[in-house]
C-alpha cells in the first residue's frame, strides 16, 4: 500500500497514538522490571552464542515429542490458568510440519507448534518453554485483547482520516479504508510486545511447576535472539528483542526460586 503525503501524516499520527495507548495498556501481572545493564549483559551473551543448528527430525518423532511435553505441561498450565481466573483452561495441541521456527496460539483454543521448533531446540525444556508460552497467551486472554485493540485502532484510523479530509472524505472511501487498516495495525502493536513479555513470565511458572529446569528453558530465547539479530525494540516491532526477553526471563526465574508459587498479580 503506497501512501501520499496526507496519508503518511495520518499514518504517523495513528502509530504514535497506538504507542501512547500501549503505554496505558498494562498486563494483568506484575512483570519484572528489566534494567538496562541486564539487557546489555543478555545482548553480549546472545552475540557470543553459537549460531543455532537444526537437526534432522521426522514428523513422527516431532509429534511424539511435543505431545509428550504438552501432556506433562498440561496440569501445570491448568493450575496457573485457574489461579489467574480464566474459565477456559482446556486447549488443543496442533502440529505443523513446516520447518519454520514458529508457534502461535489461535482463537480456536489451539496451541500450534511448528516442526522447526523441535529441529532447533537443544532440550525438552526449550520446547516446553515454547508450548507453555502459547498456553500463556490463552491464559492471559491475549487473543481477545488483540482483536479488541485492532478494532479500536481501525476506528481511530478511519476517524482520523475522515477528520483530516473533511468533506473530501465523502468522495475518497479508499483513503478512509487505508486509514482503518493503518489504525488496526497500530492497535495490534499497542498490546503485542507486552503480551509477549507476559506470556514469557507465565510460561516460566508453568515449566517450573511441571518440573523443567528454568535455565535450560531459557536456551530457546538465546537461540531466537541469535536468529533475530535485534538488540532493542522499536515502535513497529510486534515482539520484544531477544536481550529483553532473556533478561526478563532471568528475573522471573529468580522470583520463582525465591519461593513465589504463582505469578504475581497487579
PLM segments and residue spans:
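C-terminal motif of bacterial Sec signal peptides marking the signal peptidase cleavage site
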Residues: 20-23
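Long, well-structured alpha-helical subdomains associated
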Residues: 213-257, 262
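Metalloprotease/metallohydrolase-associated module, dominated by Zn2+-dependent proteases
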Residues: 168-216
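Post-HEXXH active-site segment of zinc metalloproteases
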Residues: 143-177, 218-221
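Peri-catalytic and regulatory segments of divalent metal-dependent proteins
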Residues: 25-152, 167, 205, 209-210, ...
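Hydrophobic (often cysteine-bearing) scaffold residues that line and stabilize catalytic clefts
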Residues: 13, 62, 195-198
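Bacterial N-terminal signal peptides that target proteins for export
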Residues: 1-12
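DG-centered beta-turn motif at the end of beta-strands
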Residues: 133-134, 199, 241
Amino acid at each position: 500500500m503506497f501512501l501520499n503525503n496526507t496519508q503518511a501524516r495520518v499514518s504517523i499520527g495513528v502509530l504514535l497514538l497506538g504507542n501512547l495507548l500501549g503505554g496505558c495498556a498494562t498486563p494483568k501481572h506484575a512483570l519484572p522490571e528489566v534494567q538496562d545493564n541486564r539487557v546489555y549483559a543478555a545482548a553480549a551473551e546472545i552475540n557470543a552464542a553459537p549460531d543455532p543448528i537444526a537437526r534432522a527430525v521426522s514428523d513422527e518423532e516431532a509429534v511424539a515429542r511435543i505431545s509428550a511435553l504438552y501432556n506433562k505441561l498440561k496440569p501445570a498450565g491448568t493450575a496457573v490458568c485457574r489461579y489467574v481466573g480464566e474459565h477456559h483452561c482446556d486447549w488443543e495441541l496442533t502440529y505443523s510440519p513446516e520447518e519454520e521456527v514458529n508457534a502461535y496460539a489461535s482463537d480456536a483454543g489451539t496451541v500450534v507448534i511448528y516442526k522447526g521448533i523441535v529441529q532447533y531446540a537443544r532440550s525438552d525444556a526449550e520446547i516446553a518453554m515454547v508450548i507453555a508460552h502459547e498456553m500463556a497467551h490463552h491464559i492471559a486472554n491475549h487473543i481477545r485483547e488483540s482483536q479488541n485493540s485492532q478494532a479500536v485502532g481501525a476506528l481511530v484510523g478511519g476517524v482520523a482520516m475522515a477528520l483530516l479530509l473533511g468533506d473530501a472524505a465523502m468522495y475518497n472511501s479508499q483513503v478512509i479504508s487505508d486509514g482503518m487498516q493503518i489504525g488496526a495495525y497500530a492497535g495490534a502493536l499497542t498490546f503485542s510486545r507486552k503480551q509477549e513479555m507476559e506470556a514469557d513470565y507465565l510460561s516460566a511458572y508453568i515449566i517450573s511447576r511441571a518440573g523443567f529446569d528454568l535455565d535450560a528453558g531459557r536456551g530457546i530465547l538465546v537461540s531466537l535472539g541469535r536468529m533475530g539479530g535485534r538488540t532493542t525494540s522499536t515502535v513497529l516491532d510486534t515482539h520484544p528483542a531477544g536481550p529483553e526477553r532473556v533478561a526478563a526471563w532471568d528475573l522471573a526465574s529468580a522470583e520463582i526460586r525465591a519461593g513465589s508459587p504463582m505469578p504475581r498479580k497487579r
